[in-house]
Regions:
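Short, basic/hydrophobic alpha-helical segments
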Residues: 6, 10, 58-76
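Short beta-strand-to-loop capping motifs
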Residues: 546-550
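Conserved "right-hand" nucleotidyltransferase catalytic core of DNA-directed polymerases
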Residues: 1-55, 79, 116, 145-344, ...
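Conserved catalytic core of nucleic-acid polymerases
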Residues: 200-203, 309-312, 316-317, 321-324, ...
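Short active-site loop/helix that positions an aromatic residue
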Residues: 27, 36, 85-96, 106-113, ...
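Short alpha-helix plus adjacent loop in nuclease-associated cores
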Residues: 46-63, 102-165
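Acidic beta-strand-to-loop metal/phosphate-binding motif
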Residues: 72, 76-84, 361-363
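C-terminal polymerase-core module
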Residues: 222-229, 233-285, 453-501, 505, ...
Length: 588
């Protein structure tokens, strides 16, 4: 006990502190906290909290821990961590709140090297400081069946202390690197303040109607059984629809349907192939229905209820702040960003994400944000005009591309224009367009040529951004986010062409990601500032989902539209569509 007080007193005299909090798993919100290391003023301390072996030290009482450390963790002195969000989750389980200022060296490193997946502290320290840290003594055990809780305190302390001690110097080095790379404003104004926002969202979670999921599971299972019966009838015998080998035998040997695409392992039975074969025989269509139901049932309907936290009846995802090289957030355990929405069946899954009694879900979604960013970058007069006057941009594109009046545009022409508008920024080729629209490549090339003839500004920008990427070896977003492009000059044509497509879509997708992150900051601050009974729960691509008291829905809706539309100053206005309801499906 005296040792804890002495450590807290010594750290209180240090100008800045390094902090590492260690758990026994990969889920900071729920795993067992093994211990924490603190370092400052040339001294490092390790506090064992969850070691479980014969002779292990007793866990410190929570009240004692809070009394000694909360003044430090909640004070004005910088407390640096490698992944502050994970550290804050684990500290909260000990009754501690990390609100002190400080850097997140993991996040800083990810901004500097966005294409690298992992940024372990040992590698970042070696790269930025030339300093070797001791290896994790439990790494081998954690890959097997063991864990950190069984490791002896001395071994963990010898590793944990240097990890905490390196953080102040590492934070300084990374801050200098961010300045040199012109990334400091993005880190300081967007990424670092977003950490506590995401922390709050992960803690909040979203309510799920497990009874509705259970009913859906039974219904989907019965529908799959009926489809299996019809498949058996169509084939003339039972077969395993999930086996590509058995399915291929039925399709191509027994039914003698044409082989459309060949793989090394045999004829393909992918979605594209089955859709074409369904025009000739009912069995492929039944397979598609069965696959769709199996995917929905296995991935969502049956899996999601198992992830509901029994303590609050809610699902808590984990957001990766730098989950993609473009800067987009990603969601894991579970991934709530890919909950399907296109079909009526998949919308029923969203209907199981609900608000508690007396509350509503409010969804706010940017309208065509990537197209608006393309208009901003390209300064194409036709695109700019479409967004400034608020006309249907796909109808305008169809009219321009096919040379007809807007009132004469057919649904098929608008569909082609929509594919063009969303595909051009991703390097859509004539072959790709022909595949999507089931037309000859020559006809598709003609459509693309007519598009670029009418939208010359877009073509010029596409060419200029690739040229700039080749010259600078990098591309940036409107907010300055960096993505290195080393393969833009590769000799291998496939690598080079892929890099050229990335050079085009990164400024657009990355700027959209930045806009959404700024919007999250603005919405979070505004909700707190106006003291509304509401909290942000999810970010899904260009959409924010907020849970609000019924009486606050109108104010929250207006706040979302106001703050989100003001999150960036582009050459065209940002527009946000807002809805609300008892479920996510009703709200969006």
């Amino acid at each position: 006990m005296r040792g804890l007080a002495a450590a807290a007193a010594a750290l209180g005299q240090a100008p800045e502190v390094g902090l590492m909090v260690f758990g026994d798993g990969e889920s900071p919100r729920t795993d067992l906290v093994i211990g924490l290391a603190l370092a400052g003023g040339g001294r490092a301390y390790y506090l064992p909290l969850g070691h479980r072996y014969l002779g292990a030290p007793a866990t410190l009482p929570a009240a004692l821990l809070a009394g000694a450390l909360q003044p430090l963790l909640g004070g004005r002195k910088p407390v640096h961590a490698h992944d502050r969000k994970a550290a804050a989750h684990r500290l909260a389980r000990l009754g501690l709140e990390l609100t002190a200022p400080g850097e997140d060296t993991d996040l800083m490193s990810r901004l500097l090297v966005p294409t690298r997946r992992e940024h372990p502290l040992s590698e970042v320290a070696r790269e930025r400081l030339g300093q070797a840290l001791p290896p994790d003594p439990t790494e081998g055990a954690r890959r097997g069946t063991g864990g950190r809780e069984g490791a002896e305190v001395e071994g963990i302390a010898a590793w944990a202390g240097p990890e905490a001690a390196v953080l102040p110097a590492l934070a300084e080095a990374l801050a200098g690197a961010l300045e040199a790379a012109r990334l400091a404003p993005l880190y300081r104004d967007v990424e670092r303040p977003l950490v506590p926002v995401l922390l709050d969202m992960e803690r909040a979670g979203i309510a799920v109607d497990s009874a509705a999921m259970g009913a859906m599971s039974a219904e989907f299972g019965a529908a799959m059984d009926e489809l299996t019966r019809r498949l058996t009838e169509a084939a003339g015998h039972p077969f395993n629809v999930a086996s590509t080998r058995e399915l291929g035998k039925v399709l191509f040997e027994e039914l003698r349907l044409p082989v459309i695409k060949k793989l090394k392992t045999g004829p393909s039975t992918d979605v594209e192939v089955l859709e074409k074969l369904a025009e000739q025989h009912p069995l492929p269509g039944l397979v598609l229905e069965h696959r769709s139901l199996a995917k929905l049932k296995g991935t969502y309907v049956d899996a999601l209820p198992l992830l509901i936290d029994p303590a609050d009846g809610r699902i808590h995802t984990t957001f990766h702040q730098a989950g993609a090289a473009t800067g987009r957030l990603s969601s894991v355990d579970p991934n709530l960003q890919n909950i399907p929405v296109r079909t009526e069946l998949s919308r029923r899954i969203r209907a199981a994400f609900v608000a508690p009694p007396g509350r509503r879900l409010v969804s706010a979604d940017y309208s065509q944000i990537e197209l608006r960013i393309l208009a901003h970058y390209s300064a194409d007069p036709a695109l700019l005009e479409s967004f400034r006057i608020g006309e249907d941009v796909h109808t305008r594109t169809a009219a321009e591309t096919f040379g007809v009046a807007a009132a004469a545009v057919t649904p098929d022409q608008r569909r082609v224009a929509k594919v063009l508008n969303f595909g051009i920024a991703y390097g859509l080729s004539a072959f790709g367009l022909s595949q999507r629209l089931d037309m000859p490549p020559r006809e598709a090339q003609g459509i693309i040529d007519r598009y670029f003839a009418r939208y010359a500004g877009v073509k010029r920008w596409l060419e200029s951004i690739v040229a700039e990427a080749r010259r600078a070896g990098e591309v940036r977003t409107v907010f300055g986010r960096l993505r290195p492009m080393p393969e833009i000059t590769a000799r291998n044509p496939a690598l080079r062409q892929a890099a050229e497509r990335t050079a085009v879509n990164t400024p657009i997708q990355g700027t959209a990601a930045d806009v959404v992150k700024v919007a999250m900051l603005k919405v979070h601050r505004a909700l707190a500032g106006e003291r509304l009974d509401a909290r942000m729960l999810l970010q899904v691509h260009d959409e924010l989902v907020v849970e609000a008291a019924e009486g606050a829905v109108e104010k929250v809706s207006a706040l979302l539209r106001r703050e989100m539309e003001a999150s960036a100053s582009l050459a065209v206005p940002l527009r946000v569509e807002v809805g609300h309801g008892r479920s996510w499906a009703e709200a969006h």
